[in-house]
């Protein structure tokens, strides 16, 4: 298998370590290739697969992005590429429900639930009095909550934003955090809350809908958004 970036053939993801082979040429072979397309690129690139008579799957990592960047007049084209897909890969139970609502004619056996992988580095370390959160998630909500919490926290507790960090640094921060505030919003699965819980933190906040399937006590406390 290999990864092909249609807009940048020299692209190589640097957000995490990997040894993935990168493909630098097209078109695809009807006999040799099977293409997996993320949902936000489904319309333009699934259509190209149809033109080349090449098998493909659409990987829906966030059901709330099914029509992202697609104008209403192109919804029938989008419907066609989902209808003609060999498989639809779904990241969560919530995402599967959304797919079935949007495209009820798709046979259930063509929708395959996949399970995300969590990096091995997300483990509990020596806990400190740290409440961590990711400010890029619902920034206005996190800013307001931090404002109200600031004067009410004991002096030996601190609020720590997680931003502009490598995966390893995020894992280290979560490992030392006692509490993680979740501001997930319209998420396909929402990995950060799960990573925080696996790192031994108590997770408090929003499920973003996608995390509902694992947001259970005693590791999680759900707050309605």
Language-model-detected regions and their locations in the chain:
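Short alpha-helical segment that forms part of, or immediately flanks, the ligand-binding pocket
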Residues: 171, 194-198, 212-213
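Extended catalytic core of nucleotide-activated donor transferases of GT-like folds
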Residues: 4-84
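Conserved catalytic-core segment of nucleotide-activated headgroup transferases in glycan assembly
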Residues: 93-170
């Amino acid at each position: 298998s290999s990864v092909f970036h249609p807009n940048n053939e020299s692209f190589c993801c640097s957000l995490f370590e990997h040894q993935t082979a990168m493909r630098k040429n097209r078109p695809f072979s009807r006999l040799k290739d099977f293409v997996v397309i993320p949902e936000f690129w489904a319309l333009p690139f699934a259509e190209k697969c149809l033109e080349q008579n090449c098998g493909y799957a659409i990987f829906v990592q966030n059901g709330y992005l099914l029509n992202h960047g697609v104008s209403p007049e192109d919804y029938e084209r989008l419907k066609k590429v989902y209808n003609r897909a060999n498989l639809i890969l779904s990241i969560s139970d919530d995402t599967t429900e959304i797919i079935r609502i949007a495209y009820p004619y798709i046979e259930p056996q063509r929708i395959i639930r996949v399970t995300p992988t969590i990096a091995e580095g997300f483990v509990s370390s020596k806990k400190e009095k740290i409440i961590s959160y990711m400010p890029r998630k619902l920034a206005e909500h996190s800013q307001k909550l931090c404002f109200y919490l600031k004067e009410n926290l004991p002096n030996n507790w601190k609020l720590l934003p997680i931003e502009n960090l490598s995966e390893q640094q995020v894992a280290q921060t979560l490992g030392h955090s006692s509490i993680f505030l979740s501001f997930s919003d319209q998420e396909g699965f929402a990995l950060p809350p799960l990573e925080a819980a696996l790192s031994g933190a108590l997770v408090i906040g929003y499920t973003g809908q996608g995390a509902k399937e694992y947001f259970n006590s005693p590791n999680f406390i759900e707050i309605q958004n």
